Amino acid sequence: MNYKRNVLAGLVMACLSTVPFVYGASAEVGFQQVVTQPELIEVSTAGRAVAMRKYHEVLNYPEGLHIKVNGVGYDMVQQKHHNVTGIYVLDGTKLTVHKGLQVDLSNAHPYDQADEMAHYYMSGIYAGFGRKQIDDPKYDTQVVVHGPTVIQAVGNGVQANKDSYITLDGPVKIETVPFEQADVYAAIVEEGSIGIGTSRLADTYTGTAPVSTPKPSQYATVQVTGNVGVLNKNYGLNPNPGRHGSYIVMNLGTKDSVWTGAALNEFAESGNNPHQSGVTLELKNQATWHNRWIGAKRHRSGHEELLLATGKGYTFTGSHIQTLIGGDTPETAGIIYQEDTEPIVVDVLQGYVKIVDRRPNATNTTAPIRVISNRGQLTILK
């Protein structure tokens, strides 16, 4: 490929050659239609590695963008973590990429610790701290990618925090690596929003708006491996103000579209969801969702106290989908493979959906899914 090059090179210490393997180092990228002449930003270091770090800037890449990052997320000698991230935009930055984005994120020793802050230090795309100085929508942080997006990340795929919004119109391929202790996600929001496989800008989402979104004339292929998280950052350093909701909208509308992972909604888990934060999943035309939690469960402050006081906490007790939109006919139904021990909870079901019960603990007395408001048709298959 003929790249325009903007290379930031660091030294990779010789000691890295002793590492038994490098997370993400040998990943193969599909979606070869990614643009032929993107600008390339490449960083390789023995510690912190961030390819793009921008504050309150307006950036436009008309010919596409390719990010390559190789860093070390955790110094085992000094017991110190480092940020290893592809795109890190904050404080009202507006980033628009045309003709496609590719992010390759490798990490010799990721920060795989049971730390509620671990997911902040490793993302393909991180957008945060919108409206840091002035509470006005024009100071939101925004990332919009038109065309193919391919993210292969050690850590999160995409993360949108306070007053920050990411829209990937597609096609989209996101692959993450499961950790043993740290919780990481294909998509994660904390008082921000993310749209995957949709042209509707993420800063327009509300608790009910995605349900009435006009149907696209043609769906893009979406392939996602990793959990999604709607988290309530009401603790620790820089807690969110709680002015509005957190939303993920993901459209799987082609036969080759697939999501493997589960959905954590801390607002729904705790029973305190004033802005109806959650996940809207469109699943039709025989697209598939393999529901199973991947990797480590989340550790966070306040869970035990809330559980003791109310009987509800923040931890994952099953995938929670705010709105599930199935096919328009039985022939165009979406398909769920329920492979997790915990049940799926759907607030609102629209359209036709089939669910195949593959739970390892399945019994005839427990259902693989619970639908609170059924406005469609659900078929359960064994």
Each model region followed by its residue ranges:
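Extracellular beta-strand/beta-solenoid scaffold signature
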Residues: 25-28, 40-53, 70-90, 106-142, ...
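Catalytic-site microenvironment of enzymes
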Residues: 63-65, 109
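Gram-negative bacterial Sec-dependent N-terminal signal peptides
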Residues: 1-26
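Glycine-rich nucleotide cofactor-binding entry segment
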Residues: 103
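Extracellular beta-strand/loop-rich repeat segments of large surface/secreted proteins
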Residues: 225, 247, 254-382
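N-terminal intrinsically disordered, low-complexity tails enriched in polar/charged
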Residues: 4, 25-38
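All-beta strand scaffolds that present successive hydrophobic residues in beta-strands
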Residues: 31-37, 58-63, 94-100, 135-137, ...
